């Protein structure tokens, strides 16, 4: 059996250690379904974090800007300034969209709570993600790539 070396680095978009091919991250973060790649990480075309953190810093800046916008949207939902267009009534195969104005009070209340918390949860997930990504970048940037034997 022939032993080969693989160079690995951390992806600037997801932070995970993956193979490096020709100076950029190899395709990763995907599944193959019926011969097609689905869910490929957008970091595949960037240099590893050890070499550059330009894309990582851009992601952190973009998400940081989105967080107050998401919280503001949640507040607008809470105060009634934003409402969903539709609510979903029923389950599974019997789902149907109903205009928000035609929904029952209980359905409206549930839809508003759900929408408000979807904005808040997304903001919280963004805060958590950028904290983790920044920690990985601080640890890995300007360090050596990893060589493994396969």
Language-model features: locations:
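Short cysteine-rich clusters marking metal-coordination/redox-active sites
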Residues: 11-14, 41
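Amphipathic alpha-helical coiled-coil segments and their boundaries
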Residues: 49, 56, 63, 94, ...
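Extended alpha-helical coiled-coil "stalk/arm" regions
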Residues: 73-108, 129-132, 140-142
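C-terminal, charged low-complexity interaction regions
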Residues: 103-150
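Short metal-coordination and nucleic-acid-contact micro-motifs, chiefly zinc-binding Cys/His arrays
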Residues: 4-10, 24, 34-37
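Non-transmembrane amphipathic alpha-helical segments
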Residues: 56-85, 122, 126, 133
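Short metal-binding segments enriched for Cys and/or His
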Residues: 33-55
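Short recognition patches in nucleic-acid-associated and regulatory proteins
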Residues: 17-35
């Amino acid at each position: 059996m022939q032993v080969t070396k693989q160079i690995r680095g951390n992806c600037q978009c997801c932070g995970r250690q993956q193979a490096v091919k020709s100076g950029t991250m190899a395709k990763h973060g995907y599944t193959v379904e019926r011969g097609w790649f689905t869910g490929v990480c957008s970091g595949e075309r960037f240099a590893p974090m050890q070499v550059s953190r330009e894309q990582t810093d851009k992601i952190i800046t973009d998400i940081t800007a989105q967080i107050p916008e998401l919280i503001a949207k949640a507040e607008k939902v809470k105060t009634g300034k934003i409402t969903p267009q539709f609510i979903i009534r029923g389950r599974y195969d019997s789902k149907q969209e109903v205009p928000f104005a035609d929904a029952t009070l209980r359905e409206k209340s549930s839809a508003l709570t759900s929408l408000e918390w979807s904005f808040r949860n997304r903001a919280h997930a963004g805060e958590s993600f950028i904290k983790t990504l920044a920690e990985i970048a601080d640890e890995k940037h300007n360090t050596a790539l990893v060589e493994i034997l396969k």
